[in-house]
């Protein structure tokens, strides 16, 4: 057999620093192609200007000069139709994610690499599983510039797995393994010669995870894995001069219905799953406004600026940020609920309009900083930081006022706040 034809859908600009190129193409449940690339690949020409993820910035108030000479390429996920006619950037801020996988609810995940040189340093980011959402910013930047997870304009990892070399991803729903493997995510680790098994629990609009070792062995450099049409798990090994091989793991038992029925009948789990499904559906409704200019999105999103769920708050803030500033600026400046105020002012600061700076700083001054928890306080400090980065240096009056306000917080019990 041979291909009838070979057609170039899109040239991708690969400028090698460390071999972090375009790694995988996956067909999504929406019959669209999802392409994941590492941080050596620039956004291709012709991507939609209204993509959910746009124009990554370093956004450090005191950048490291040696990092500043690097461009702002980040690992990212593209989405395109089967003909390759329309392209958009879904999410970014990764180092070198190797693969993508959708769970049974249609939620997307990737397994991102750490930077081994950074081990033991404050900016080290462990190898991590990320839940990919519309417009998601996951904070990888060059050198020392990696964002801490508490930055309000980013999203946290869903699971950290420490030192490893991420490779293939696959959910057990494609195989014939019994419970609990059926709902697990299988992740390849080339460095340690193992396959990890991740169990997920819905939490709000995202998930929490636990993991264990499903399989490991010496000289078992797992490169990729997938479930075959027979329901078995296939994986391939090799690379960098190591032994290459193709392996199959199959289940030869019969899954009983009793255990599945017992879990399904657990009222607490049923209610948890219903609540989580509703939260994810709400997040999807908010995400529709990440690419749509429609003032109705402001009223829909505004209540969720005050949500305790970080994933809902992120989706709501981005939905508002994508609307015309004149439609929500005054509402942001007059918001009185501390968490909602911080999220709204974050959106205003990210727009980088110098004419809004004094009013924004005045609104920040009204926040009850002394009574706010550490996480809310860090969110507020991020707004000050982004104002000075994107809106420009403050006036002498604004500078003195900001120094006086922030000086009252030091020293703080949180090292991150300090």
Task: Annotate each predicted stretch with a short phrase.
Residues 1-288:
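Beta-propeller domains with acidic blade repeats across secreted/periplasmic ectodomains
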């Amino acid at each position: 057999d041979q291909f009838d034809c070979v057609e170039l859908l899109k040239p991708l600009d690969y400028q090698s620093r460390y071999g972090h190129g375009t790694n995988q193409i996956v067909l999504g449940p929406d019959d669209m192609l999802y392409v994941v690339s590492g941080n050596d690949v620039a956004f291709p020409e012709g991507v939609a200007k209204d993509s959910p993820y746009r124009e990554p910035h370093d956004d450090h108030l005191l950048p490291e000069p040696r990092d500043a000479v690097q461009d702002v390429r980040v690992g990212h996920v593209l989405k395109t139709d089967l003909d390759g006619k329309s392209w958009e950037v879904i999410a970014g801020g990764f180092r070198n994610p190797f693969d993508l996988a959708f769970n049974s609810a249609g939620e997307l995940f990737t397994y991102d690499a750490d930077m081994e040189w950074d081990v033991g340093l404050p900016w080290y980011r462990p190898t991590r599983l990320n839940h990919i959402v519309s417009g998601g910013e996951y904070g990888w930047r060059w050198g020392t510039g990696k964002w801490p997870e508490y930055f309000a304009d980013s999203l946290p990892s869903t699971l950290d797995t420490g030192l490893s070399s991420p490779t293939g991803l696959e959910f057990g729903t494609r195989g014939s393994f019994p419970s609990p493997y059926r709902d697990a995510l299988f992740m390849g680790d080339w460095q340690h010669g193992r396959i990890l098994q991740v169990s997920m629990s819905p939490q709000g609009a995202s998930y929490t995870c636990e993991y264990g070792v499903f399989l490991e062995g010496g000289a078992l450099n797992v490169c990729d894995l997938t479930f075959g049409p027979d329901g078995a798990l296939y994986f391939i090994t090799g690379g960098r001069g190591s032994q290459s091989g193709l392996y199959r793991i199959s289940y030869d038992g019969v899954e009983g219905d009793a255990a599945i029925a017992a879990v399904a009948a657990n009222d607490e789990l049923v209610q948890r799953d219903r609540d989580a499904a509703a939260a994810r559906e709400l997040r999807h409704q908010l995400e529709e406004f990440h690419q749509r200019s429609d003032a109705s999105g402001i009223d829909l999103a505004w209540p969720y600026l005050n949500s305790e769920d970080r994933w809902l708050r992120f989706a709501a803030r981005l939905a508002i940020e994508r609307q015309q500033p004149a439609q929500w600026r005054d509402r942001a400046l007059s918001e009185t609920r501390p968490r909602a105020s911080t999220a709204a002012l974050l959106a205003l600061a990210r727009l980088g309009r110098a004419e809004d700076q004094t009013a924004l700083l005045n609104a920040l001054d009204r926040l009850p900083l002394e009574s706010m928890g550490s996480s809310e306080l860090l969110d507020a400090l991020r707004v000050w930081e982004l104002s000075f980065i994107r809106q420009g240096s403050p006036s002498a009056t604004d500078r003195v006022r900001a120094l006086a306000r922030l000086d009252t917080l030091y020293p703080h019990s949180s090292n991150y706040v300090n």
